[in-house]
Every structure is written in structure tokens, then in C-alpha cells.
Amino acid sequence: QSFHLLPRQSALTNVELPLNYAKVPKKERRERALKALERVGLADRVNFKPNQLSGGQMQRVAIARAIVNNPKLLLADEPTGALDTKSGAQVMELFQKLNDEGVSVLMITHDPEIAAHAKRVVMIRDGELQEKR
């Protein structure tokens, strides 16, 4: 999978990018990006460039970038696919917290253990929607 991170920029700068487009002032941009990286467990990697990060760490930078603008809807395609079990559990815990804060999370996964975290599960089988719960 590709996380569309800017290869020559730090994790922090990559997370700041959508805030830059939204014209958020520099100081607030930095604070919000640092908080997002902290939420995904990467506070100690803020100055690392993508080539200095593991695949799972790059995935978490992409998640931090997705949540930095405080979205009402988060679309996540295989958000734990490149993560080890511990990091995957941390991401699912973060998604649960975001949902508790009012963010709707629409997640696509092939992993039944990850799907078990969802309040509602809809499967596509042979081109048809099947609701499990």
C-alpha cells in the first residue's frame, strides 16, 4: 500500500500538510500535528522522514494526517494491514476514542478480529451487501 507521504519531509511536516492547505496558522498547525502524532504513538518519530520509518509507522503517520483536521467522517481502507498486533490494537483503540468523540469511522478490512471492533458490520459477498450486525 502507498501512504502518499512526502518522501523528503518529516513525519511532522507530512501531518501538517492538510492544515497548511486549510490556512491554519503555523503555531496551531505544529501543535495539532504533534498531538495527532502522539495519538498514533509516534511522538518520538516526529522528525523522521518516511524512509527512516517502518511500514507500520508510515501507516500511522498517514492516520495522523487523516485525523489532524478533526474530521466528522474517517474513511479507513485496511488501516491495520501493515501493523503488528500491538500497533493494530492501538489504532483500533484510537478509532474507538474518535468514535466516542463523535467521529464516524467507515473501515474496510478483511480481518475478522478487526471487524469485531465495529458497532455495525456489512459484508459484500458475491456483489451483494449482507449485514452481519
Regions found by a protein language model. Give the residues of each.
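Conserved switch/coupling elements of ABC/ABC-like ATPase nucleotide-binding domains
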Residues: D126-K132
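ABC family nucleotide-binding domain
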Residues: Q1-R125
